[in-house]
Regions:
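Gly/Ser/Thr/Pro-enriched helix-cap/hinge segments flanking short amphipathic alpha-helices
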Residues: 67, 79-80, 88, 98, ...
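N-terminal secretory signal peptides
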Residues: 1-41
């Protein structure tokens, strides 16, 4: 305990010093900055030799300290998640790497998913990224990405082959946004190899326009997480693409040749010892094409590497989007928008680079949301097995405080997290947390290692006092059933007013976790349509004020019962959630106020809206649609 406190103090002191240094005119060499940036008790930022055993930060599980009394502690959850994928028609096995053994790390990362209303009928469809295997497939039998159309009865129809999305390869992440502002949301999919930009034709089909859009890459890259964002606020969606490892299979050592091990088990080599990739930023030129501005925008001036997932949001309340990147085995990256077309990595100064005791973690997934309802966006990040997941609370001054242990997320360290999302599972107006787990190495099955390839999920209920309660074993069979999960998306696919999840798994059919609730609480959904801002409204911030009957225990007296959320192109691990923003309202009878801050700077205010309705709101404050959603006539 003494050393833990000492580490925290030193970590805070270093962060404070770096923050103050950034405000001075002192100029240091890159070498000096890196010396200051290295954790007091952490690992050195050096290249590990090829063939070294995988080094992952270890954290002891620890219960949270006693917090303020919570009105929900010990009360029934009131919701159950049930996997209805097969009954709903999601019967296609998703492929990724070897089933029992992998030669390369390439075979381990898995794919993302999207709840994606591609036909604009306000019923969520499902897109699943698919993968590949080293040995390949016979012609005509290649696994391809899948698109499932919502039948509005709880089931889906596979429309992949006529959609134009049947692309094969080592698929990774997906993100959604209307890059050409034609009113139809488009789809970007990252790959190990060439990425793919699919333009929505507005008739149920897509056209791949990667080359025409200027996104064709001149070399082999392992592209990872992606996000559309309007970083320069010109009304056109730009594109961020993370890069994991600069991987050449011809030169990457095999496990048995390089003695690559995990807890004594021979496994795929890396990422330590392998060259990290360089993240990419493409500026939308406004004519349907993009320009690579990665280097001049500051994407390559980072301490951390091995990028996996990302999240783009206004994390410092400046009105400009920043980018947070979960890096594997190195410090995280936090690109802060300089408002001049460039970014600076300020992860260390902001306190989001390392663990509480200043060590690099193996980050996987990222979700952003205001869990304590203080009007500032926080970050939750999944990490490797043996470590906690991370919860960073926004302090409002451009920095964050690691509240993992204080909030109750430090009790679990055994499972390996991938997908993650802030999600109001019970519509009480407070963001809960869902985590999808699954080990990276199939080789752990059948060994003496305390791990399994397929793992259950974590479900944390928000106690409204800054802490969470682990209710994983009470969340239903969809939570407790083991799965080889990777990315998942969140959305209300059956329009019944509660949030569901679709989970992409490796070498298995996906999961469709339907949320069955007995609570009958209020909610409101808001979909935005930009005019001066990008058409999708990505980057817009929505504030909802309603008397939810659930006091803000962590707020100052007199604080209104407000929630905030932003429209984002990606969420969790490699995935894209519903672009309709969902607010749980507990017992509220009406919405007192909706305030929308658009990327253009315009602010719209609407008052006295009804609950349990979908509102489609155009920039300028015009309500294009106001309807009560009719739940699916459930067959599944």
């Amino acid at each position: 305990m003494v050393r833990s406190t000492e580490n925290a103090v030193l970590s805070f002191t270093r962060r404070g010093f770096l923050k103050s240094l950034s405000r001075t005119a002192v100029v240091l060499s890159l070498e000096d900055v890196l010396k200051l940036a290295r954790p007091a008790f952490g690992q050195q930022a050096t290249q590990a030799p090829k063939g070294s055993a995988r080094q992952a930060y270890k954290a002891p599980p620890r219960a949270a300290p006693k917090g303020a009394p919570s009105p929900v502690t010990g009360t029934p959850l009131g919701v159950q998640f049930v996997d209805v994928a097969k009954e709903a028609g999601l019967n296609v096995e998703m492929i990724f790497g070897g089933e029992h053994r992998n030669k390369y790390l390439l075979e381990t990362t898995g794919c993302g998913a999207a709840f994606f209303d591609y036909d604009q009928d306000d019923w969520l469809d499902i897109f699943l990224v698919n993968g590949w295997r080293l040995e390949g497939f016979p012609k005509g039998h290649e696994p391809v990405c899948r698109l499932f159309k919502n039948n509005r009865d709880g089931t889906f129809t596979d429309v992949t082959m006529k959609s134009g999305l049947a692309r094969s390869g080592w698929g990774q992440a997906c993100c959604v946004g209307d890059y050409n502002n034609d009113g139809w949301n488009d789809l970007f999919v990252s790959y190990y190899g060439q990425n793919a930009l699919f333009r929505n034709n507005g008739n149920g089909t897509f056209t791949e326009v990667t080359k025409e859009a200027g996104l064709l890459q001149d070399r082999l890259r392992w592209n990872s997480g992606c996000s559309f964002l309007d970083y320069n606020k010109d009304g056109h969606l730009d594109l961020f693409v993370g890069n994991y490892i600069d991987l050449d299979l011809k030169t990457t050592p095999l496990p048995e040749d390089a003695n690559c091990t995990y807890k004594g088990i021979v496994v795929a080599c890396g990422p330590p010892g392998l060259e990290g990739g360089k993240n990419l930023l493409y500026r939308n030129k406004g004519d349907g094409t993009f320009e690579d501005v990665s280097e001049k925008a500051g994407m390559w001036g980072t301490l951390g590497t091995y990028a996996l997932s990302c999240g783009a949001a206004d994390l410092d309340n400046t009105g400009w989007p920043n980018i947070y990147v979960a890096n594997d085995s190195t410090s995280a990256t936090y690109y802060v928008n300089q408002k001049d077309g460039t970014f600076k990595d300020q992860a260390i100064e902001a306190g989001v680079a390392y663990s509480p005791d200043g060590k690099p973690q193996a980050g996987m997934g990222v979700s952003i949301g205001d869990y304590n309802r203080d009007g500032m966006l926080d970050i939750v990040k999944t990490n490797f097995a043996g470590d906690t997941d991370s919860l960073f609370m926004n302090l409002g001054d451009g920095s964050f405080d690691d509240r993992t242990y204080q909030a109750g997320l430090g009790i679990n360290t055994r499972l390996l997290g991938w997908g993650v999302s802030f999600i109001d599972i019970d519509n009480d107006g407070w963001l809960d947390i869902l985590v999808a787990n699954g080990h990276v190495y199939p080789e752990v099955d059948g060994t003496q290692v305390d791990a399994a390839y397929a793992e259950r999920k974590y479900l944390y209920r928000n106690l409204r006092n800054g802490q969470f309660e682990d209710l994983s074993l009470s969340g239903g069979s969809g939570i407790t059933t083991d799965a080889k999960a990777r990315g998942f998306a969140v959305g209300d696919y059956d329009n019944d007013g509660d949030l569901d999840a679709v989970v992409n798994c490796v070498n298995a059919v996906p999961q469709l976790l339907r949320c069955d609730s007995t609570l009958n609480r209020s909610w409101v959904k808001i979909r935005l349509v930009g005019t001066k801002s990008n058409k999708t409204g990505i980057g817009a911030r929505i504030k909802v004020v309603a008397d939810t009957g659930s006091p803000v225990l962590t707020a100052k007296p007199g604080t209104p019962f407000a929630q905030i959320e932003e429209v984002r192109s990606c969420n969790g691990y490699y995935s894209a959630s519903d672009l309709r923003i969902h607010f749980g309202l507990n017992d509220a009878k009406k919405v007192d106020l909706v305030e929308i801050r658009w990327p253009s700077g315009a602010v719209d205010t609407l008052k006295d809206l009804d609950v349990k309705r979908l509102y489609v709101i155009e920039e300028g404050g015009k309500i294009l649609k106001n309807e009560a959603l009719v739940p699916a006539r459930k067959k599944a």
